[in-house]
Amino acid sequence: MNEEKRGLCMNIRYLKNVLRKARKIDDTIQLSLNSAKWEYPEGKVHETQEERCQNVKKKLFEGWLSRDQFLKECQTIVRSQLDQDRNTSKSPLKSQQQLPSSSTTQVSERLDPYAKEVQVQLSPPEEVQIVLQSELSVEQIIRDQTWEVLTNACPGMFKDWRDTYKD
């Protein structure tokens, strides 16, 4: 994997920023469906509703495929980093080490009743892995909502996106 991709995947802020930008098509789907009616210069044939819906669906699926590939590559990078950490470290990973809160900053029990509990420290790759799992769940929610907008604008044209996306 190239270092640029690795840097994007291992930095949570960059990772979320890439996904935010890649989700623009989903965020603007209603605008895409509506504006297609008004963008044609005079004399040019307007596309039919079916053509417009198919074009939006095509762009949507291209974006989804691109995000799927990016997330899979990031998962591979994180897994390899976790494996590398496990192989190079003879001691357990940070997540397996439990640190008593007395070694950290003291917090009033009134402010945080769990301050005296044992805290778990995650390594950076483990944090990224958790974020990736969360982003995969977010993807499903976004796709459900986007597909609902598309099927409302294009009634009777499409099945469930999970069936259609596989085709």
From Swiss-Prot:
It comes from the Eukaryota. One of its GO terms (biological process) is protein import into mitochondrial matrix. One of its GO terms (cellular component) is mitochondrion. It holds the Pfam family MIX23. Residues 89-106 have a biased composition (Low complexity). Residues 81-108 are annotated as: Disordered. Belongs to the MIX23 family. This is Protein MIX23. The gene is cid2.
